[in-house]
Amino acid sequence: MLKTRIITALILVSLVILTTIFLEPVWFLFISSLFVLVGIWEWFKLFSSRVDGYIHYFWIFPVVFMCFIGQPISFVLSNYSISTVYLFEHSPVFYVVIYLSLAFFWLVIAPLMIINYQKKLFFNPYLVITDLKGKRSWSDLMIGPEGTWMNFFLGNFLLWGMWLNLVILLFNNPYILLFLFLIIWSADIAAYFSGKKYGKHTLADNVSPSKTWEGVIGGLIAGILTAFLALHFFREFLGVDMIQASPIKLILLSSVTVIYSIVGDLFISIIKRDAGKKDTGILFPGHGGILDRIDSLMAGSVAFMFWGIFLGLFDFGLL
């Protein structure tokens, strides 16, 4: 199993590096879009008993979403050197609302959902917290047509929002995007092995019994070390603000990114646990599905951009 995991991981890492650094951006856009579509399908299948009657609506939101961003993305594809600030200058309300909504969900809502799930409380999207009692979990809200549309919107919003986040990083500086990938990858690997070897204290046993505090510490250390190593090796490719960043800012950025990558992992674990599934799919041998591989990236990428801008390490014209 470990050998299979390693081989699959090496193939995926090679694909990401190839499309991020060496190929034209259109390849990253195309392949990442396919990944997102499969991820949305997996999301729906986790709620299969609730969405079977509405699965034919699967394509509506992606098509509408792509219509909104099609014009500015097409412009960028025709001129790779243009800053993504263009996107926000021409559709400011749409993009700012998308980005800030993503940030609010991952930085505030998702952690609250995880904490309350761990404490066996019922947390719904209207921020009403009550004891579970008759309800199985927050996802019981997904039952019926209204719940299906809630589930439908949330899955598309989180996944396409992540995609847009990665595209912004790519077109501003592909090495900053690779910087993000390396932090999350190293943290995932270190958390897995340190958790298996030293893990004794569970992080959130009701959410994911295999996650431990020792794994979190291992992931944090690896993420911070990777950030410093990446800064050293990519120095000539990163922006001036990144190169001149103080060690404290770099530690903060990498730490927050790792912490919220764990939030993304735990959030998807909640959905899998509610669905009674171990994995979201079977696409990647030894790893599960798309959502199993990008759960950390869904939250980590948002935290990375938000705190990178907040700390003054890069400015994409978002805030």
Residues of each region from the PLM?
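Membrane-embedded alpha-helical bundles of polytopic integral membrane proteins
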Residues: 2-212, 216-255
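Feature representing long, continuous alpha-helical segments
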Residues: 5, 115-117, 269, 296, ...
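Short helical (or helix-break) motifs at transmembrane helix termini and adjacent helical loops
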Residues: 186-196, 260-273
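Re-entrant/interfacial helical elements at transmembrane boundaries that shape
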Residues: 196-197, 272-275, 298, 303
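Hydrophobic transmembrane alpha-helical segments of multi-pass transport and channel proteins
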Residues: 255-263, 290-298
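Interfacial loop-to-transmembrane junctions
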Residues: 274-297
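Final/C-terminal transmembrane alpha-helix of multipass membrane proteins
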Residues: 293-310
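Juxtamembrane boundary at the C-terminal end of a transmembrane helix
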Residues: 308-319
